Amino acid sequence: MTTSWYTADDCRLEDLRALVEQQTDRADYPHASDVEGNVLGYDARSLGNSRDVQAELARALMAGPGIVVLRGAFEPAVVDRATGVFFDLIAEQKAAGVVGGDHFAQPGANDRIWNALDKFALRDPRAFADYYANDTLALICSAWLGTGYQLTSQVNVVNPGGRAQVAHRDYHLGFMSQEQAQRYPAHVHQLSPVLTLQGAVAHVDMPVETGPTLYLPHSQKYGPGYLAFHQPEFTSYFEANHVQLPLAKGDAVFFNPALLHGAGTNHSTDVRRMANLLQVSSAFGRAMETVDRTAMCAALYPVLRSYEGSIENVVAASAEGYAFPTNLDKDQPIGGLAPPTQAELVLRAVAEKWADARFAEALHAQQDRRV
């Protein structure tokens, strides 16, 4: 970073090219199983969860290619059950005349479920728990964001013939016009990516013809990229030089939100390409969507009381893990610097085997104190 404020004049294609034409060296990433198209691949089933693994994943996202593929991250049977829930929700949306929008594609071209996280939890709490108990998901979220992260989810189905998205960066600054992004100093452009982790879980097998996401590895390191992706010459370069990798059902891709990317065109005739798009926010930032986490916790608690999977991972995916903002007149930090979080309440209730009614009363009382 050599400037305090980026402008459109700072966007030089040769600077981006110098970054993205470097090669990813697998020797620098000892836990990786392969490098394909400059993208690191990992076998999620044998990855482990050590701090060394977390450090390597974070380094790959920040200083490496900016993207990792975690193969076999989700069990196919767990994915299939979630897929059934998602298709039911899509059918209900269509019956109600709801047309899903898309930030970077034509409205109506795809089927989209916004706020899919809480819709999933309320529709089938057990399936939700089985899905989000996933250790690989928790591993990479905590590697990039630390504890207290907040999940949101949008399900995207690109139907046969669905066209590609325009290349872009993601939330926060990626959801601004070039003019808006210029209003933020350069150090905020560096900050924005570390507030969010982007991911996608493949819910069907995705050969290249179905249009899995296009990526430009190493592009997250380009300083003025939040301005550059609006410019035609950068779009053209992306279209000529992107990487596109096939995925199997249950594979997961995670990437730095500053990585230039975009969903591909579905050239197949019979594959509805479904992905669960995960946006994971730092406890210190705020997510794009509002999610009724109190309702989710109430729905999930009866499942969690006897759940044999990772309760901690399910709670991390559903409950509010940060104490603020809150009303400190009513929600005072007794015995510590901050009042208990919703996540702490859920875990305490499970550990102490509270009855459903007792938990529901405590949950809503806590929520009332926060406003």
Tell where the protein language model's regions lie, with residue ranges.
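Catalytic core of non-heme Fe(II) oxygenases with the double-stranded beta-helix
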Residues: 139-140, 165-166, 173-237, 242, ...
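Flexible loop/turn segments at secondary-structure boundaries
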Residues: 76-78, 159-160, 207-209, 222-223, ...
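Non-heme Fe(II)-dependent double-stranded beta-helix
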Residues: 10, 23-67, 71-178
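Short conserved micro-motifs at the rims of enzyme active sites and ligand-binding pockets
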Residues: 81, 226-227, 265-267, 286-292, ...
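Fe(II)/2-oxoglutarate
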Residues: 1-63, 314-325, 329-371
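Catalytic core of Fe(II)/2-oxoglutarate
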Residues: 229-302
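Charged, cofactor-coupling segments
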Residues: 281-308, 315-329, 366-370
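Active-site environment of non-heme Fe oxygenases that use a 2-His-1-carboxylate facial triad
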Residues: 3, 7, 44, 49, ...
